[in-house]
């Protein structure tokens, strides 16, 4: 074969490809690494699901109990608090006023304002909220009811700008939510789920460019620029030196009568501040904080019918229906007539008697067959005085089923003042009866989730979603389990636990009942014989009337503490323990998955490195074979000079040998 033909064959094309070690090809993703990532994602997902077990439990509890008990709005965990209506006040017939005053050195000047409030009333003309600037400036913002519709009027230095919603009638006694926003001279207004009503006054087209330019204007010159723009006839945009927020309209001659809930203005929750006796808040007139007045005993049958009919609606609408349409049994005909015929008074679930707003007499309880809602009053039936400051919430009552179902620790049991023997009442004498199941409504702070309505929102959008009616209640149902027989007499029986009396509990405002005051247990009686159990058994608080016990000395309603020291409570605390264990499981799962991924990654790197060395050796062997197999080409030419070296060297050696 000619050399040229051989050179143009397959031989000359191989050496360039196999002349040296090639760079390793990009390796495919190792299978163990992919498996490790999948395991990590699976572990994280499992931990997330386990951490939400309590949420699933609450939702299941909500749906499975809706036929017999009122909705427990605060039964949901912390993440679902966006539906909380906030603090609620009742404004009486005589008119009332809640005033929040900014300190003189802390008065804000805003270019954008947000206002949201929920209310219910039968009035066709009233002023709900008014925000005024410092004296002499004349800026203001007012939310009012005119001819049964909601409107807002504001002035930030140019002219009065009005915006209203004529299609939504709010004087029907139902619960309505109003959302208002202002940006310069522009404004939007929305009532309930009606379309957003927008207002763009004339002369506002230059405000966007002005807003951009105003960022470069020093603050001390802002007022001068505004005055100059006022002379030019342009719309001003800043609400200067806001001095006070007034709720109720009493100072405007158009007092509001009804219910106001969860008022929110630029991050301030004025009603919550009023309930906490904030020094910047002043209250006057016929005003009542929801939770202070007498309660309403709702019939179980009526409540079940109402909830089943409105279960497709939101929690706010369902609670409103329950509050405005339920009637009660076991009352006198006069009170029944006032419930069904009085249209000026508001019936608020768990807060109000269906009587005149100025009548503060306590509701009379009925006997049996009804849901017992908390009566947050003391034993005395005297009407509480009308508060000139923000009213306080008296200590809550003591419910034994609540202590049994939620998880009664020693610091949740009542003081000795409430532990007096009593006879009669359902589920009083025999505690072993598993059919003694009483639905009890109590504060929502007892299920392991702490909520303080005075906390600021996470963002402004939280207060632009839904505003349910009254949510300072949680309905709990005691578990259907055998309970020990507790003796109410002091003669014989198992030793009880008596708590040392503590100082009288101070009056607590609404939303501040999540503190813990531990009480020290003291042995009351020693064991009387070998057959008597030695375990401490809490005595059941005797009732003041059938099914309800009022404990004026009850210190505070604590929250469950899953990580705190002390004795472990009854089975009601399992829910809190499950939340703690789920958090621990999530952490352990994430750590284990991360360690597994690291091990898999190290193993994959080790295998990949070994595979690279083997491929390099194989390349060298192939190069050696290809070089030895070739007899022509460049390789042979390189080795050609080496051939004559051997004879010349041998010749030299021969010469040396010859001469020697």
Swiss-Prot record:
The keyword Metal-binding belongs to this UniProt entry's keyword annotation: yes
Gene Ontology MF terms: calcium channel regulator activity; metal ion binding
Modification after translation, per record: O-glycosylated; contains heparan sulfate. Heparan sulfate attachment is required for synapse development by mediating interactions with neuroligins.
Annotated CDD domains: LamG
Result of altering residue 350 to A: Abolishes heparan sulfate attachment
Subunit structure: Interacts (via cytoplasmic C-terminal region) with CASK. Specific isoforms bind alpha-dystroglycan and neuroligins NLGN1, NLGN2 and NLGN3. Interacts with CBLN1, CBLN2 and, less avidly, with CBLN4. Interacts with CLSTN3.
Residue ranges annotated as Cytoplasmic topological domain: 606-660
BP GO terms, sorted: cell adhesion; chemical synaptic transmission; neurotransmitter secretion; presynaptic modulation of chemical synaptic transmission; regulation of postsynapse assembly; synapse assembly
Function: Neuronal cell surface protein that may be involved in cell recognition and cell adhesion.
Disulfide cysteine pairs (residue numbers): none
Gene Ontology CC: cell projection; glutamatergic synapse; presynaptic membrane; protein-containing complex
Entry protein name: Neurexin-2-beta
Domain Laminin G-like per the UniProt entry, residue ranges: 87-295
Binding positions (Ca(2+)): 139, 156, 238, 240
UniProt membrane topology term: Single-pass type I membrane protein
Coiled-coil annotated residue ranges, if any: none
Signal sequence annotation: 1-46
Transmembrane segments: 585-605
Extracellular side: 47-584
Positions bearing carbohydrate: 186, 350, 561
Principal cellular location given in the protein's record: membrane
Gene that encodes it: Nrxn2
Compartment annotation: Presynaptic cell membrane
Region Disordered, annotated ranges: 1-27, 408-458, 537-571, 627-660
């Amino acid at each position: 074969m000619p050399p040229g033909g051989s050179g143009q064959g397959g031989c000359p094309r191989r050496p360039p490809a196999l002349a040296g070690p090639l760079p390793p090809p990009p390796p495919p993703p190792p299978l163990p690494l992919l498996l490790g990532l999948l395991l990590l994602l699976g572990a994280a997902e499992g931990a997330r699901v386990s951490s939400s077990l309590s949420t699933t439990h609450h939702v299941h509890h909500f749906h499975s109990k809706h036929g017999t008990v009122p909705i427990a709005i605060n039964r949901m965990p912390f993440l679902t608090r966006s539906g909380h209506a906030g603090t609620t006040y009742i404004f009486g017939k005589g008119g009332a006023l809640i005033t929040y005053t900014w300190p003189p050195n802390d008065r804000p000047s805003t270019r954008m304002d947000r206002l949201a409030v929920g209310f219910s009333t039968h009035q066709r003309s009233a002023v709900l909220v008014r925000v005024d600037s410092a004296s002499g400036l004349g800026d203001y913002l007012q939310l009012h009811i005119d001819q049964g519709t909601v409107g807002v009027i504001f002035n930030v230095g140019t002219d009065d700008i009005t915006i209203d919603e004529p299609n939504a009638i709010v004087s029907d006694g139902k619960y309505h939510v109003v959302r208002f926003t202002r940006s310069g001279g522009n404004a939007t207004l929305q009532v309930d789920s009606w379309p957003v009503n927008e207002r763009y006054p004339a002369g506002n087209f230059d405000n966007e460019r002005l807003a951009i330019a105003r960022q470069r204007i020093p603050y001390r010159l802002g007022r001068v620029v505004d005055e100059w723009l006022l002379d030019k006839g342009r719309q001003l945009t800043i609400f200067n030196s806001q001095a006070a927020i007034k709720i109720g309209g009493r100072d405007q001659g158009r007092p509001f009568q009804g219910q106001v809930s969860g008022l929110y203005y630029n991050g301030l929750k004025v009603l919550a501040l009023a309930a906490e006796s904030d020094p910047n808040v002043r209250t006057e007139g016929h005003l009542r904080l929801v939770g202070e007045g007498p309660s309403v005993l709702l019939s179980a049958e009526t409540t079940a019918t109402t909830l089943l009919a409105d279960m497709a609606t939101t929690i706010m609408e369902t609670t409103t229906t329950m509050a405005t349409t339920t009637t009660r049994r076991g009352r006198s005909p006069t009170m029944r007539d006032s419930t069904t015929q009085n249209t000026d008074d508001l019936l608020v679930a768990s807060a109000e008697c269906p009587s005149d707003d100025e009548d503060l007499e306590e509701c009379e309880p009925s006997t049996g067959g009804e849901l017992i809602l908390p009566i947050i009053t003391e034993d005395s039936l005297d009407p509480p005085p009308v508060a000139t400051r923000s009213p306080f919430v008296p200590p809550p009552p003591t419910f034994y089923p609540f202590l049994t179902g939620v998880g009664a620790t020693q610091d949740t049991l009542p003081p000795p003042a409430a532990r007096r023997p009593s006879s009669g009442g359902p589920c009083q004498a025999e505690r072993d009866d598993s059919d003694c199941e009483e639905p009890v409504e109590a504060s929502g702070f007892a299920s392991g989730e702490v909520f303080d309505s005075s906390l600021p929102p996470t963002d402004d959008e939280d207060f632009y979603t839904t505003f349910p009616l009254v949510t300072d209640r949680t309905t709990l149902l005691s578990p259907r389990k055998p309970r020990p027989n507790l003796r109410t007499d002091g003669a014989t029986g198992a030793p009880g636990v008596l708590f040392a009396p503590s100082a009288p509990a101070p009056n607590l405002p609404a939303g501040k009942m999540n503190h813990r005051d531990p009480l020290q247990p003291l042995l009351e009686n020693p064991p009387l014989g070998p057959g008597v159990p030695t375990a401490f058994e809490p005595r059941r608080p005797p009732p003041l009337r059938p099914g309800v016990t009022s404990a004026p000395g009850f210190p505070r309603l604590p929250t469950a503490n899953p990580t705190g020291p002390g004795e472990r409570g009854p089975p009601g605390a399992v829910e809190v323990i499950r939340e703690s264990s789920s958090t621990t499981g999530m952490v352990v799962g994430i750590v284990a998955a991360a360690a597994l991924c690291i091990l898999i990654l190290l193993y994959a790197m080790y295998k990949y490195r070994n595979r690279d060395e083997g491929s390099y050796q194989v390349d060298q062997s192939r190069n050696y074979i290809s070089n030895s197999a070739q007899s022509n080409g460049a390789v042979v030419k390189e080795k050609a000079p080496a051939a004559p070296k051997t004879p010349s060297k041998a010749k030299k050696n021969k010469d040396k040998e010859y001469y020697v």
